[in-house]
Amino acid sequence: PYSKLFIKNLSSKTKIHSSLKIKMPKQLIFKNYSNELFREKYDLIVIALSLSGIDFIGKELKKFKIKSPILILTKGLKYEKNSKTILTLSQQLLKKNNKLNISVLKGPCLAKELARKNQTSVIVANKNIKTAKYIGKIISTKYYLIEFSKDVVGVEINSAIKNIYSMIIGSGQSLNRSSSLFQKSILEMK
């Protein structure tokens, strides 16, 4: 579910991110996936896969007792045909392993904007607010501002539907129309 060449480039001495064209911080450690990875203790495990990769990582996480907090960057919802329910990504992973300490991070946040160190605000949600704040301490900077919530499911659902509203707003013919759609979207999310 990932590019080995991409990880190799990130793991090299130069640590260049091929699509963002930036040098990554030396503190970040990038490793190819193996079962051995989850036997180690980390400050934080970050899951930044495509939506289709969540099933894969869920099956892998099921095999281990993981003590490190996990932060999901991926957005989306999954419809389960058998039970006719919609699951958030945290629910999907917890269904595989209910002992995981899962947090979610949601934007709006474009990687290129963040890489340019443009002011960005996101929210980290975990049912235990202390865990969310612990993660915030690790990842926040003067330009990357973090807010916190205990409502993991609410944050995930709003993040997923935000993209739908964004596309609708972007299709507006004028600023007045776009502003009106934006206001309506915010009211519906409350």
Predicted regions and their residues:
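Short, charged/polar "capping" segments at the starts of alpha-helices
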Residues: S3-N9, Y79-N82, A132
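Rossmann-like NAD(P)(H) cofactor-binding subdomain of soluble oxidoreductases
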Residues: M24-K117, I135
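Cofactor-binding loop segments of dinucleotide-utilizing enzymes, especially the Rossmann-like FAD-
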Residues: P1-Y2, K75, K127
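NAD(P)-binding Rossmann-fold cofactor-contacting core
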Residues: P1-I22
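A general structural signal for well-ordered alpha-helical segments in protein cores
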Residues: I7, I54, I86-S90, A132, ...
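Internal alpha-helical scaffold of NAD(P)-dependent oxidoreductase catalytic cores
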Residues: K96-N101, Q119-K190
